A protein has these predicted regions:
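Short, Gly/Pro- and small/polar-rich lid/capping loops
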Residues: 1-41
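Generic signature of intrinsically disordered, low-complexity, basic-rich segments
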Residues: 8, 52-54
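Metal- or metallocofactor-binding catalytic centers and their adjacent structured scaffolds
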Residues: 54-124
Length: 124
């Protein structure tokens, strides 16, 4: 059942922030001394036209999230490219509902296809 407070994503913006760590962090054979943070701003609108915005941020810790023989730069670039693709997909996502429902629908319906498409033909 829809409610007047249901929201739909109207806009999504992505910012990459370079951050140097205070101390080196070791992940297996690799050492992290800096990281790129992906910061996102999402704007939503409810059925009455009221708007709200929210922010989220996560570090793209290449060595931690993607241990591989590929170079750091190849993995870092791919993570940033996928973040840009996700941001575009969120901006076009037209599902309406409670924010948790909207997010869950994106995870279940959009993300698997986006991930498969992005990974098609990529090296491990």
């Amino acid at each position: 059942m829809s409610k007047k407070t249901d929201v739909c994503v109207e806009k999504a913006e992505l910012y990459f922030l370079p951050v140097e760590t205070r101390v080196p962090l070791k992940f297996g054979a690799e050492t992290l001394t800096y990281v790129t943070c992906a910061r996102v701003r999402v704007e939503v609108e409810d059925r009455e036209g009221k708007r709200a915005e929210g922010w989220g941020e996560t570090p793209l810790s290449v060595q931690w999230v993607w241990p591989a023989d590929l170079s750091y730069e190849v993995r870092h670039k791919a993570l940033k490219e996928f973040c840009m693709e996700l941001t575009g997909a969120w901006a076009e996502w037209e599902v309406e509902g409670h924010p948790m429902e909207v997010g869950h629908a994106f995870l279940e319906e959009a993300l698997p296809e986006l991930l498969d498409g992005f990974n098609a033909g990529r090296e491990e």
